Amino acid sequence: MRVAFHHIAYQPLAVCNALSMARLEATVRRAGLKPGAPVMDVGCAYGEVSMRLARAFDVRVTAVELDPVMAEGAEARITAAGLSDRISVRRGTSAATLTALPPFDLIMAIGSTEPAGKGLRDPAAVFAALSQHLTSGGALLWGDLFWKEEPPAPLRQLVETGGYYVSHEAWQTAARDAGLEVVSAEISDEAEWATYRTVMETAIADWLDAHPDHADAPTVAATAHRIKMMLDFGAPYLGFGHYLFRKG
């Protein structure tokens, strides 16, 4: 199986975005989850967040991951941690998994691509679709990029290749339009961004140094360069927001 940038860059990250685990835990705490509560982690990567939530809040986590390499990695880490009885890894899309299972007390989608279904990107429509799979009083923990100001057209085109982004305020407006209460809305600080970027860039550099002749090395290096340029150029325009929305 081919090696991709995210297979390497995400391995050492606690949270695969510009967000600290401490801030994430504080946001989850506001959801008021009871022991044994059903939680979905959309795009769980290697399972680090799922494991932290299972330990810290004694919840039952359905960890969904479409990428087979990361899903296998998540299963291995969860088994090694002795948490297989509290975390179930589902390989596939979150939309299909949500349809197949009962409602959740918390759905967590942090930097997820089309979590409510392929082609559905309008924020209010995404939130409305996800809220259908929440219990009454359940919460959606949403984390994603936002535009701090209108970006140059080439930057928007590059960044929105895999998603659709709005302003910090517009994410919250979309949640209200979907019938959700905004419980909290925070913005990641520069230290969180620095940690996110440094960990990824170090992991990629180390892998390339160790595998200079790997067939996928040129593609990994090119992707790393593209992402670095995007984040460098986008720094004045891009923020990362994390929100807790509650269903009435």
Language-model segments: residues:
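Conserved SAM-binding loop and adjacent beta-strand
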Residues: I8-E25
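Glycine-rich SAM-binding Motif I of class I
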Residues: G47-M51
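Class I SAM-dependent methyltransferase SAM/SAH-binding core
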Residues: R52-A96
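A short SAM/SAH-binding and catalytic strip from SAM-dependent methyltransferases
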Residues: L106-R121
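A short glycine-rich, Lys/Arg-flanked "PGG" loop and its adjoining helix->strand segment in the class I
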Residues: A124-A139
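Conserved Class I S-adenosyl-L-methionine
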Residues: E186-G248
